[in-house]
């Protein structure tokens, strides 16, 4: 805490300055005290030391807030790395194949529907054509699971 007070003194900032204010003032003051610019070498060393301490404590605070804000896997919507059962895999496979069959039926040429084809149909048809159905079938039927 004393080092923060000394840092804000050296930077000519109030003690209530934000981290962004401190970083901006540090850049400005570093140019002023830099030995290559004719500044005071001792003050530059002190400024660098205090700024390093500030960055470390700022990093610790950021780590603490990250730890507190990490959602649990079941809350985040992301899958966990638990084992998936064979019935779950089979269920997913059969749902994909049912979707494939429904889409094939939809995309089959029907004389009555030809007059009602809209641009959305063509976009959906192209997306359906781009799905690697053979790869999915091979993946789900492999002995890997």
Swiss-Prot record:
Domain (J) spans: 6-82
- Region of interest (Disordered), residue spans: 58-80
Q: Which GO terms describe its cellular component?
A: host cell cytoplasm; host cell nucleus
Give one Pfam family: DnaJ
**Which key words are in the record?**
Activator, Early protein, Host cytoplasm, Host nucleus, Host-virus interaction, Oncogene, Phosphoprotein, Transcription, Transcription regulation
Q: Where is the composition biased (Acidic residues)?
A: 65-75
Subcellular location per the Swiss-Prot or TrEMBL entry: Host cytoplasm; Host nucleus
| Gene3D superfamilies attached to this UniProt entry | DnaJ domain
Q: What does this protein do?
A: Promotes efficient viral genome replication by accelerating both G1 and S phase progression of the cell cycle.
The free-text domain note is: The common region of ST and LT proteins comprises the J domain. This domain is essential for multiple viral activities, including virion assembly, viral DNA replication, transformation and transcriptional activation. This domain is also required for cyclin A-transactivating activity of ST.
Instruction: Report quaternary structure and partners.
Output: Interacts with host PPP2R1A; the interaction inhibits PP2A activity.
Instruction: Name it.
Output: Small t antigen
UniProt organism field:
Budgerigar fledgling disease virus (BFPyV)
Upper classification of the source organism reads:
Viruses, Monodnaviria, Shotokuvirae, Cossaviricota, Papovaviricetes
């Amino acid at each position: 805490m004393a080092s923060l007070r000394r840092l804000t003194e050296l930077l000519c900032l109030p003690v209530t300055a934000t981290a962004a204010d401190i970083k901006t003032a540090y850049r400005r003051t570093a140019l002023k005290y830099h030995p290559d610019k004719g500044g005071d070498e001792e003050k530059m060393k002190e400024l660098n030391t205090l700024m390093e301490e500030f960055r470390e404590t700022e990093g610790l605070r950021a780590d603490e807030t990250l730890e507190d804000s990490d959602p649990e896997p079941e809350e985040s919507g992301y899958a966990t790395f638990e084992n998936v059962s064979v019935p779950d895999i089979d269920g997913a496979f059969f749902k994909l194949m049912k979707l494939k069959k429904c889409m094939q039926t939809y995309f089959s040429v029907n004389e009555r529907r030809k007059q009602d084809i809209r641009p959305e149909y063509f976009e959906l048809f192209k997306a359906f054509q781009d799905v690697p159905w053979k790869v999915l079938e091979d993946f789900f039927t492999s002995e890997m699971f």
